[in-house]
Amino acid sequence: MSAVLKDAPRLELMRDGDLDEVLAVESIIYTHPWTRGNFADSLRAGYDCRTWRHGGELLGYFILLAAANEAHLLNLSVAARHQRSGHGRALLREAIDIARRRAARSLFLEVRPSNYAAQVLYTRLGFRRIAVRRGYYPAHVGREDAFVYAIALS
């Protein structure tokens, strides 16, 4: 089910106080969610951690690491009830804009082969699959590979 929003969502800096909401979203949409420690470490390290909110409601978020003329999108997530409503596309565009402002020449990300919807989104926004990381993700049984996608920003 998609929720229709009348006003535009806002991109905000993620803060420690957001982590309970972020973890609630993670636990619903992922079989192997990030931990509080993963998010807290990202905040402490100064990564670009953003939330996507409408009227105070958390719609999604991302974690972006930019360094040495490259950026790596570590996590981009949309709350289950807001998926397939354009929020993933909007968040990805925001992440690309931030990576450009950080002087990144390229942006990389990993995605599970089983996450076909995300792969379609990345391809539509100009990302190309460039590699496979074997056994990258934990899975119910064993490990799952990751497809590596990249986009040139300059």
Q: Where would I find each of the regions flagged by the language model?
A:
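Conserved catalytic-core motifs of GNAT/GCN5-like acyltransferases
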Residues: E110, T123, R128-D145
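Active-site-proximal loop/turn and secondary-structure-junction residues that shape catalytic pockets
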Residues: S77, P113-N115
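Conserved catalytic core of the tyrosine transesterase superfamily
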Residues: M1-S2, S106, R112, D145-A152
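ABC family nucleotide-binding domain
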Residues: Q83, H87, N115, L121-L125, ...
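Acetyl-CoA-dependent GNAT
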Residues: S2-S85, R89-R102, G135, A152-S154
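Short glycine/proline-centered loop/turn elements that form peptide/ligand docking sites
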Residues: L92, N115-A118, G135-H140
